[in-house]
Design a protein with these regions (language model features):
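Outer-membrane beta-barrel translocator/receptor signature
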Residues: 113-115, 121, 126-201, 207-214
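Membrane-embedded beta-barrel scaffold of Gram-negative outer-membrane proteins
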Residues: 160, 187, 277-291, 409-412, ...
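Flexible loop and strand-edge segments within Gram-negative outer membrane beta-barrel domains
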Residues: 200-211, 221, 225-278, 284-301, ...
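C-terminal beta-signal and adjacent terminal beta-strands/loops
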Residues: 417-418, 481, 582-585, 608-665
Length: 665
């Protein structure tokens, strides 16, 4: 039965969490595994089971991860107190730098095109990309081979869906084929049309628009060990939206706005044996926002990366050697004038060796990065180019020891580094004067983690696993793009932050029943903050804030998920709960203590997917999200004081009934 297989995959994922110190979470939208141990267990059916429409639908259960934003225009990821501008985010290996406008999302993605999400919460491995202060997220899009049954050469999948809260209707079509041996191709297109939604208290939220995404991917495997593929992915969100999408209750300046991303990748893979697993990816990504007030803002990122893995066994010693190199270039633009575009060139090389001696694994690693930002210095009429240059070695070391069968202790250290990015495109379009900071330092930090993990088997189809972690990261020289008294744009270092916390995860699989519970606690202490002028009538003191750190400390997060598979009728039912405790917190930008209210949100869902018979290929997913119509706003949002200006509160959707029907043939 299909759902019996699904829970075998969930069980395998539970084993994976105890196989690596990075940790693993099986979500109600897609199974996500940590990258540190190299294991990656993915069940792509689960993304449809949760009726995922946004990134938060597939990531909110992960310990250490917070996701804010009520629509595709403003969804933002936070990981251990670091925003997505301080994470390394890739799609099919293509780096995503989308810092166009701070009131909008930097990441645009359609979950319906995603088959896997690999997450490293915290920075432990040097292999997970340059500039990862708080961790990394790697999205992988679907392939034709994922959808074709054995012996099939062509197929299609049609989908239609409805969401009641915003009167959303969605449609999707996929065509996939392997016309000749070794050649595979997929074409997918999705559309969503929707109206404004409503929060639990009846407030108008979101926008009135149409979203469109498509994926074209062609691959060819040859000579047993070689594969080459090319893909083109497009995402666009367009419609009537607030000028500041994250202030979802402010509709006085609603107008037609469009935000889109295009990513093109060319990939070569060579995998002859365990001695060599090579992957080379060249890519181009463009984020572009078309706005009647802000005009056209965007960021282009081009790059190439080569990564390899070699596994060597010698007696009692097994070595897993990961090594590679990476280059990327980012440019901002602001049309029609585009006076002073900036450019980042980043080069890095890394090596990591996991040495396994029976019950002990030691993983040393090191990355070297050369980072340069080509900016400007001078006043209007006499502006000259100025280049910031940084060189940094970032070592890492991890130890994992099996104390007794199934019980492991682990500890890790990593130095983190991130150079200054191109300035946000909105600021670039306005800047006329620049003041170079010849004493500017790159952001660095020291990341520590320790914990225990346990896995036990009850039977062939049943198991349980536990994971407990404590982490501490000390950041210094956080960078802020600041306006000086004479109106010039200047980058400054604005202190640091110590972020610590605890992450707990427990899973139980009993044949057809799967239970998971998690807890996340984090604490942020700001160091040596720099005073700045207050805005919008705020009472001082006010401080310059870096956009790579979250807006404030957040409340404790609890999650619970239960799923049961009725294999005899090919049906899965599930329940998901997320609860945030209230907390008195101080924002990064001031000393005002604000109480963030608690909230609890319950979802129920069910999937029917016949594994045989005349209805094989049919899949029906239905659920009620925010079952009890709770009034709440994400604790990750910019505005902490919900009792302040109501226009700045980004209320989350109220009760929402979703249904999606698809048929694959």
């Amino acid at each position: 039965m299909r759902f019996s297989g699904l829970f075998k995959l969930s069980l395998a994922a539970s084993v994976a969490v105890c196989a690596n110190a990075a940790g693993e979470s099986v979500l109600s939208g897609v199974e996500v595994t940590g990258m540190g141990g190299g294991a990656n267990t993915v069940d792509d059916i689960k993304i449809s089971t949760r009726n995922a429409g946004l990134v938060k639908d597939v990531m909110r259960d992960i310990p250490g991860v917070y996701v804010g934003g009520t629509n595709g225009m403003n969804q933002k990821i936070y990981m251990r107190g670091v925003s997505d501008r301080g994470l390394n985010i890739t799609i099919d290996g293509a780096k995503q730098n989308g810092n166009t406008f701070h009131h909008n999302a930097d990441l645009l993605i359609d979950p319906d095109l995603i088959k896997a999400v690999e997450v490293e919460v915290g920075s432990k491995s040097v292999a997970n990309g340059s500039g990862a202060l708080g961790g990394s997220v790697a999205f992988k899009t679907v392939d034709a081979k994922d959808l074709l049954e054995s012996g099939e050469i062509i197929g299609a999948k049609i989908r239609s869906g409805y969401a009641s809260n915003s009167s959303e209707f969605s449609q999707g079509l996929m065509l996939f084929t392997t016309p000749v041996e070794g050649l595979d191709f997929i074409a997918a297109i999705n559309h969503k049309g929707y109206d404004y939604g409503k929060s639990g208290n009846g407030n108008k939220i979101g926008g009135d628009g149409n979203d469109l995404s498509y994926l074209l991917k062609l691959g060819y495997s040859f000579l047993d060990a070689h594969r080459i593929s090319i893909s083109r992915e497009h995402n666009e969100f367009k419609g009537i939206y607030p000028i500041r999408a994250e202030f979802g209750s402010s509709h006085a300046n609603d107008d037609y706005r469009k935000y889109e991303r295009d990513t093109t990748t060319l990939k070569y893979e060579y995998k002859p044996s365990n001695l060599l697993n090579l992957e080379v990816t060249a890519y181009n990504t463009e984020h572009k926002k078309d706005d009647p007030v802000l005009k056209i803002l965007g960021v282009k990122t081009n790059g190439i990366n080569a990564k390899a893995k070699s596994v060597v066994e010698s007696g009692a010693l097994t070595q897993t050697f990961r090594y590679g190199t990476e280059f990327y270039q980012s440019k901002n633009f602001s049309k029609p004038d585009n006076h002073y575009p900036e450019k980042v060139n980043n080069y890095s090389i890394y090596a990591e060796d996991a040495l396994n001696f029976s019950s002990l694994t030691i993983t040393p690693g090191i990355r070297y990065t050369h980072h340069e930002l080509k900016s400007y210095d001078g006043k209007a009429g006499n502006v000259k180019s100025y280049t910031y240059k940084f060189n940094e070695f970032t070592p890492a070391l991890a130890l994992d020891y099996e104390i007794v069968k199934g019980l492991n202790a682990f500890v890790s250290y990593a130095k983190v580094f991130r150079g200054p990015d191109v300035i946000e495109s909105m600021y670039a379009g306005r800047a006329k004067n620049f003041e170079a900071n010849k004493n500017l330092k790159a952001t660095t930090g020291n990341s520590y983690e320790t914990g225990l993990k346990y896995h036990g088997d009850i039977s062939e189809a049943s198991s349980y696993s536990l994971s407990a972690k404590y982490f501490m990261t000390k950041y210094k020289n956080l960078i802020v793009d600041s306006n000086t008294a004479n109106g010039a744009l200047k980058r400054i270092n604005a202190g640091g932050a110590d972020i610590s916390g605890v992450e707990l995860l427990a899973r139980l699989n009993l044949d057809a029943l799967s239970l998971a519970v998690s807890y996340t606690h984090q604490s942020v202490k700001y160091k040596d903050r720099v005073l700045t002028s207050c805005r919008r009538g705020a009472i001082g003191p006010c401080y310059s804030t870096s956009n790579v750190i979250g807006y404030r400390d957040q409340g404790d997060k609890y999650t619970f998920n239960a799923e049961y598979a009725f294999s005899s009728i090919d049906t899965l039912v599930g329940y998901n709960l997320i609860y945030f405790a209230s907390k008195n917190t101080v924002s990064a930008g001031n000393d005002k203590s604000v109480n963030i209210p608690s909230y609890a949100v319950s979802d129920i869902y069910a999937t029917y997917s016949p594994s045989s018979g005349k209805f094989k290929g049919l899949e029906i997913n239905a659920g009620i999200y925010n079952l009890f119509n709770k009034v709440y706003a994400s604790q990750s949002q910019r505005t902490a004081d919900y009792t302040g200006d109501p226009n700045y509160v980004d209320w989350e959707p109220g009760r929402n009934f979703k249904v999606n029907v698809s048929y694959k043939f």
